[in-house]
Curated annotation (Swiss-Prot):
<dbReference type="GO" id="GO:1901289">
    <property type="term" value="P:succinyl-CoA catabolic process"/>
</dbReference>
<dbReference type="GO" id="GO:0015938">
    <property type="term" value="P:coenzyme A catabolic process"/>
</dbReference>
<dbReference type="InterPro" id="IPR000086">
    <property type="entry name" value="NUDIX_hydrolase_dom"/>
</dbReference>
<feature type="region of interest" description="Disordered">
    <location>
        <begin position="72"/>
        <end position="94"/>
    </location>
</feature>
<dbReference type="InterPro" id="IPR039121">
    <property type="entry name" value="NUDT19"/>
</dbReference>
<dbReference type="GO" id="GO:0010945">
    <property type="term" value="F:coenzyme A diphosphatase activity"/>
</dbReference>
<feature type="site" description="Important for coenzyme A binding">
    <location>
        <position position="34"/>
    </location>
</feature>
<protein>
    <recommendedName>
        <fullName>Acyl-coenzyme A diphosphatase NUDT19</fullName>
        <ecNumber>3.6.1.-</ecNumber>
        <ecNumber>3.6.1.77</ecNumber>
    </recommendedName>
</protein>
<feature type="compositionally biased region" description="Pro residues">
    <location>
        <begin position="78"/>
        <end position="87"/>
    </location>
</feature>
<comment type="function">
    <text>Fatty acyl-coenzyme A (CoA) diphosphatase that hydrolyzes fatty acyl-CoA to yield acyl-4'-phosphopantetheine and adenosine 3',5'-bisphosphate. Mediates the hydrolysis of a wide range of CoA esters, including choloyl-CoA and branched-chain fatty-acyl-CoA esters and at low substrate concentrations medium and long-chain fatty-acyl-CoA esters are the primary substrates. Highest activity seen with medium-chain acyl-CoA esters and higher rates of activity seen with the unsaturated acyl-CoA esters compared with the saturated esters. Exhibits decapping activity towards dpCoA-capped RNAs in vitro.</text>
</comment>
<feature type="binding site">
    <location>
        <position position="112"/>
    </location>
    <ligand>
        <name>Mg(2+)</name>
    </ligand>
</feature>
<comment type="similarity">
    <text>Belongs to the Nudix hydrolase family.</text>
</comment>
<feature type="domain" description="Nudix hydrolase">
    <location>
        <begin position="10"/>
        <end position="242"/>
    </location>
</feature>
<keyword id="KW-0479">Metal-binding</keyword>
<dbReference type="InterPro" id="IPR015797">
    <property type="entry name" value="NUDIX_hydrolase-like_dom_sf"/>
</dbReference>
<keyword id="KW-0378">Hydrolase</keyword>
<feature type="short sequence motif" description="Microbody targeting signal">
    <location>
        <begin position="355"/>
        <end position="357"/>
    </location>
</feature>
C-alpha cells in the first residue's frame, strides 16, 4: 500500500508553440512518447517533466539568479493563494534553506525538458523577464549530448550548465496551470504533479534522449485528440483532460494573454476518485456531485453495480472523465469556471468514435 509519504513530487510543462506551417494564429503542443521500458505509463505520449530532485530546490541557485532576482519570489510576483491539501496528504516540513516550491518546481520542469527533449528554457542572466509576448527557447549549446548525459547522471549539473551559459532557468515563462495526483489503482507509483504552461513563439528543435523518450510530435489540441481516437498515440486521462481544456483557445496569443492575466490565481490540484461501474470506469473530479473529498479515497475506489450509461444519465452536476476503453474517453462537464480558469467542453464519442462537443 502506498501511503501519502511515498508519493513523489513532480512537475510537467505543457509547451505551446507558434505554428506557422499552416496558420500563423495556431499553436501546437509538444508531446513526448515514453519508452516501452518505462515503469510508469510505458509508451504514452506525455508533456515533458519528471520528479522533483533536491538539486532543484538547492539554495545554490540564489547566486545564479543574483543580483537581478532575489529570494523569496525571484521576480515571480506575489504568491498565489494556497489550495488546501487533500485530506491525509502531506509532504512534511520543507527545508527552510530550500527554494520556494513555486521556484523549485519550475526549475524541475525546465531541467526535465532539457533531459528528455534537449529543449533549453533558459534566459540570459542580464535579461529582463518582463515581456508582453511568448518566450523563446535557447539555442542548443555545443556539446549538448555530453551536458545532457551529465545532468541525467547528476541533476546538480544543471546548475553548472546554466552557469556555463551565463543563463538562468526561465521560471518567469512558466505559468501556473493546475496539478494532478495519481489516483488509487493498479499503478503502484504515485505522483503529486504540478502542471505548468509555457508559450513559445516558435517550435524549438527537439532531440529525444532515446532512453526515456523515443519520439515526439507537435500537435494541436484537436489533432492530439484525433490521433488518440485513431490509436496513433495513447494519452493518460490527465493529459487528455488538459488537452481538451487547451482546445478552448483558438490562438497562441489568446492562450498567452489568458495565462498572463491570471498570475495570482494559481492552479488547483486534483485527485481523481475512480468509480468502477459494471461495464467501465469513471474518473470523478472535484465539483462532481459524486466526488467525496475524504482521505479514505487516497487508498480505495468507489464501485457500483450500475452501468456507466446509467450513472451518466442520472448526473446533474458533473466534472468527470468516462473511460470506455483505452482509446475512448468522454468528458462530462457542467461546472462554471472558477479561479478565472477554464474547463474543457463536454466531449462525447459515438459508437463510430466520432466526437461530438
Amino acid at each position: 500500500m502506498s501511503g501519502p509519504s511515498s508519493w513523489r513530487r513532480a512537475a510537467t510543462v505543457m509547451l505551446a508553440a507558434g505554428w506557422t506551417h499552416s496558420s500563423p494564429a495556431g499553436f501546437r503542443l509538444l508531446l513526448l512518447q515514453r519508452s516501452q521500458n518505462q515503469r510508469f505509463i510505458p509508451g504514452a505520449h506525455v508533456f515533458p517533466g519528471g520528479v522533483l530532485d533536491a538539486a532543484d530546490s538547492s539554495p545554490d541557485w540564489v547566486r545564479l539568479f543574483a543580483p537581478r532576482h532575489t529570494p523569496p519570489r525571484f521576480g515571480l510576483g506575489p504568491e498565489p493563494p494556497r489550495q488546501p491539501p487533500f485530506p491525509g496528504l502531506s509532504h512534511g516540513d520543507a527545508d527552510p534553506a530550500a527554494l520556494p516550491d513555486d521556484v523549485a518546481l519550475r526549475i524541475c520542469a525546465i531541467r526535465e525538458t532539457f533531459e528528455e527533449a534537449g529543449v533549453l528554457l533558459l534566459r540570459p542572466r542580464d535579461a529582463d523577464p518582463a515581456s508582453q509576448e511568448p518566450s523563446q527557447a535557447l539555442s542548443p549549446p555545443a556539446g549538448l549530448a555530453e551536458w545532457r548525459s551529465r545532468v541525467r547522471s547528476d541533476p546538480r549539473c544543471f546548475l553548472q550548465l546554466c552557469a556555463h551559459l551565463d543563463c538562468t532557468p526561465d521560471i518567469w515563462a512558466l505559468h501556473d496551470w493546475g496539478g494532478w495526483l495519481t489516483p488509487y489503482g493498479r499503478i503502484t507509483r504515485r505522483f503529486d504533479t504540478t502542471f505548468l504552461l509555457c508559450c513559445l513563439r516558435d517550435t524549438p528543435r527537439v532531440e529525444p534522449d532515446l532512453a526515456e523518450v523515443v519520439g515526439y510530435q507537435w500537435l494541436s489540441p484537436s489533432e492530439a485528440t484525433e490521433c488518440f481516437l485513431s490509436k496513433e498515440i495513447w494519452l493518460a486521462p490527465p493529459q487528455f483532460y488538459e488537452i481538451r481544456r487547451l482546445d478552448n483557445f483558438a490562438s497562441l496569443s489568446a492562450l498567452y494573454r489568458f495565462c498572463s492575466d491570471r498570475p495570482l490565481e494559481g492552479g488547483e490540484k486534483w485527485l481523481p476518485i475512480i468509480l468502477l461501474t459494471s461495464d467501465g470506469t469513471i474518473h470523478l473530479l472535484p465539483g462532481d456531485e459524486l466526488y467525496v473529498k475524504d482521505s479514505d479515497f487516497l487508498e480505495k475506489n468507489m464501485s457500483t453495480d450500475k452501468k456507466t450509461e446509467e450513472i451518466v444519465k442520472e448526473g446533474k452536476v458533473l466534472n468527470r472523465v468516462v473511460i470506455h476503453s483505452p482509446y475512448v474517453y468522454e468528458i462530462y462537464m457542467t461546472l462554471p469556471s472558477e479561479n478565472k480558469h477554464v474547463y474543457p467542453r463536454n466531449y462525447v464519442v459515438n459508437k463510430r468514435c466520432t466526437a461530438h462537443l
